[in-house]
Amino acid sequence: MSTVREEQLNLEIPASDVGSRWQKLINWFQPKASQPLYDRMLFTLAMALLAFGFVMVTSASLPTADRLTGNPFHFAIRHGIYILISLAVMLATLRVPANSWNQQSGKLLLLGLIMLLMVLVVGYEVNGAQRWIKVGPITFQAAEVAKLFFCIYMASYLSRREDEVREATKGFIKPLALLFIAAVLLLMQPDFGTVVVLSATTVAMLFLAGARLWQFFAVFITCVLALILLIIVEPYRMQRLLTFLEPEKDPFGAGYQLMQSLIAFGQGHFSGAGLGNSIQKLQYLPEAHTDFIMAVVAEELGFLGVLAVIATVLMLVWRALIIGRRCLMQEQRYGGYLAYGIGIWFSIQAFVNIGVASGALPTKGLTLPLVSYGGNSLIISALAVGLLLRIDHERRMLGRKVAPRGGAE
């Protein structure tokens, strides 16, 4: 009986019966188990975060959506639509050769910088920050796009100028000059959180490319001095720092959001109050379904829920770094550095988001990749995951000496 079942499971439908197109479709979704054509673990982890994010955004946004729109599922429906668009973008990215992004990296970086400049000219303000551009019914956050485009450019630059980065100071300074331009445009919005993520990602990629150690000490000292200057020049940053250090001194003013987030973490205990049973999301905690969604996770699912999210994000980052390492071992420099860049970007942004929600870091206004509410963040994060899958797919196909799907290189 078991032999018959095995034969049925291994049965292949002949192309003559269903047509060549159907056979190609079957082959696409049924790769050989011994050598899958994509990183199944990476894909599964990304889908798990998207699904978990939908559940938590639905739970966290019900009171706010009901108060603002009269429909408690308003944000949940929008988030579901964003997820569908993100999946479509991810699948479309899988069909684009990685070398196409490499060839257009300079133009993409220029486009990203132009978008950051446009925000200052035609953008509109939300919650005290001018970060959004509106084109008809569509609004997008230029900073999210700039992060991805900068990673793509850095990967291209390092793949072409790796020796120059290692041996000459100018090879190290060139990308930092571009980073400085992007940072100035971001600080004018202001968006200090994206500056932190972009700077840390760029410096980490230069380190992995083999830049000299003394150069990093110089960058570190410069960044510390610049940070001190920014805190002194902008009063609101000083206020955020003081609030972060002693939020209980102004629990109903500047320290209100952090205090409510800490209360949520405290009420969650080990296993949480149960899904949907958060008290802090009932108009107490601002931005409960966006930047502070981890506070709701902590309250409803407890320490175990927070640990599960952190573990999933870390595994996704680990897969990205593994892809990068394997690409470099096969002399695929661009794909390797891009995978490294995306992995570092995700890890830093997740670290900052969780650190802010738990009171370990000052407020920055960054989303949790693939989890928090927000169409821009979701779509760009999904596109980045699609790039990782495509890079790994090409690496595997190169190992099998077969031309990659999705177009000629």
From Swiss-Prot:
Subcellular location: Cell inner membrane
Entry similarity comment: Belongs to the SEDS family. FtsW subfamily.
Ranges annotated as spanning the membrane: 42-62, 72-92, 108-128, 135-155, 178-198, 213-233, 303-323, 337-357, 368-388
Identification of the protein by name: Probable peptidoglycan glycosyltransferase FtsW
Alphabetized PANTHER family for the sequence: CELL CYCLE PROTEIN, PEPTIDOGLYCAN GLYCOSYLTRANSFERASE FTSW-RELATED
Organism: Idiomarina loihiensis (strain ATCC BAA-735 / DSM 15497 / L2-TR)
Pathway assigned to this chain's UniProt record: Cell wall biogenesis; peptidoglycan biosynthesis
Alphabetical list of Pfam families matching this protein: FTSW_RODA_SPOVE
Main location: membrane
A Gene Ontology biological process term: FtsZ-dependent cytokinesis
GO molecular function: lipid-linked peptidoglycan transporter activity; peptidoglycan glycosyltransferase activity
Record has Cell inner membrane as a keyword: yes
A GO CC term assigned to this protein in UniProt: plasma membrane
Enzyme Commission numbers on file: 2.4.99.28
Membrane topology (UniProt): Multi-pass membrane protein
Known role: Peptidoglycan polymerase that is essential for cell division.
UniProtKB keywords: Cell cycle, Cell division, Cell inner membrane, Cell membrane, Cell shape, Cell wall biogenesis/degradation, Glycosyltransferase, Membrane, Peptidoglycan synthesis, Transferase, Transmembrane, Transmembrane helix
NCBIfam families (UniProt xref): ftsW (TIGR02614)
Catalytic activity: [GlcNAc-(1->4)-Mur2Ac(oyl-L-Ala-gamma-D-Glu-L-Lys-D-Ala-D-Ala)](n)-di-trans,octa-cis-undecaprenyl diphosphate + beta-D-GlcNAc-(1->4)-Mur2Ac(oyl-L-Ala-gamma-D-Glu-L-Lys-D-Ala-D-Ala)-di-trans,octa-cis-undecaprenyl diphosphate = [GlcNAc-(1->4)-Mur2Ac(oyl-L-Ala-gamma-D-Glu-L-Lys-D-Ala-D-Ala)](n+1)-di-trans,octa-cis-undecaprenyl diphosphate + di-trans,octa-cis-undecaprenyl diphosphate + H(+)
